[in-house]
Structures are given as C-alpha cells and as structure tokens.
C-alpha cells in the first residue's frame, strides 16, 4: 500500500534528484547520490563501468528488472563566440523553444560552476526588426559574468565540451501537484527509490527476484544496453505522455503498447493492464509515436526478454 509516508519520501527524493544536474554524460553526482541512498537503506548496489546503478531488492525466481534513468536532456558548449557568449549543442532531444529565456548552469572540467541564461540571438522585441527562429544555431548562453570576448571566457576555465544544465525549477504544491523540469525521468527514479524504501521500512513482500536499474544514457538511446544475464522480463518506468489522441491523463497509469521502436511484448502489456484493472487503478493503454525507452536498447543488445513500458 502506498502510504503517505512513502509519498512524502518519494517527493523528498525527487527534489534531491532534480537538484543534481545530470545531462547525459554528466551523471556521476546523481549516481553517487543513488549509491549512498541505497547503501543507507542496507542494500548492496553495484555501479557499472558505464555508470548505471543496479540493486537487487529481494525475491526469488522469474527475474524482473525495473529501469528508470537519471540522465536528462541538456546541452554542451560547442564553441565560445567572439562576443563572449557560448554556442550550445543539444544533448538528447532537447527542444530550444522550452529553454529560451531559461536560467542555466555551466559546469567546467576543473569543478567550477557558472550561472547564465539561455537566449536567442535577438531577444529584444524593442530592437530586432523580425523575430528570430528558435533553433539551435540561433541560441546562445549569456553568462552572469563580466566577459565580452573569447579570452575573458577562457579565463573563467570554460571551454568546448563543458556541460550546460537548465534550472529544474522544482515545485511540489500543497495540493500535491508537481511542476519541474526533468520529471523525465527523475520522478520514476524517485518512485523506484520509494519501492526500495518500502521493502525495507514497511515490509513490502516481493514474490519474484527484482532488480532496480538506474541508467545514465537513456536520452541518447543506449542506457539499458546491459542488464543482469538472468533477466526474464524488463519494464522501463518512464514518463507518461498526455496529448493528441492519447487516453492517458496526469492522474492515470500509462501503459505503452507501441512506440517508435515497435510493439511492446503483447502478453506483458496484457498482464500489466489486467493487473491495473484488478487493483482498481485508473489506467490507459496508449501508443507513443515519437518515443523510445531503455528496454529497447536492451533488446537491441540481444537479450532474450519480455519487455514493457509504463
């Protein structure tokens, strides 16, 4: 049973995870946090060479992997412009239209962090004759530093390849609504931490072997490319979609039947929908035409598993 204590725990973990900048390729701080949290619960998590965190939380037989990712969309410094602004390149499927005017952070390789703002190259309606199209080549990072040339930026230690992360702006309202960047997929990661917490603290019983997997390259397509060899089923726990002709709302369990990688395992989707129905959960089975998940990377790596996405 999902108690108020577990809900509060999940909310606390969500705030902690979103406060850690982790665009794909820059996830060590996030995985260090996961390792410490799981170890503090009494588990023995493992960190792969790639950076994924996995942990067995109990049960015997019919091994199941539940996967969530802690890497996020973001950007990288592509070059330093003559005017001291940074030209970015996207990490993952980042949409610049959602970031124009957003506060951001730039992380250098020697451990420094600078704040700035994402702007298009002609942000002022009082100056520009025409609107600038919001696309990558028209975006730049204006640092909160008194620099106006390449040399000034270089003196800060900023260089090509440095990571750019957007302000998460996480808010959990009194009515229980969550507003934040990077709910894809840090909310799912927080939920899986909540499951691990409930097993230890509230005695949740597990009737099969369950491994939680926190991946770090989902946003670029290969996060779930390695899982325990005995895995029989794997379910990606990722963001649900709302919109267009989909049946799901923000208040429902979302079960994906098909995405850009094709159909999910028919029998597993059926079992998930039957389980939701038997437990009285409000749910929808939907098709996501422009979606991909960790478990598809697992299949492409040659694993013989049944796969699902919720």
Regions found by a protein language model. Give the residues of each.
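N-terminal hydrophobic/helix-forming segments and targeting peptides
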Residues: 1-309
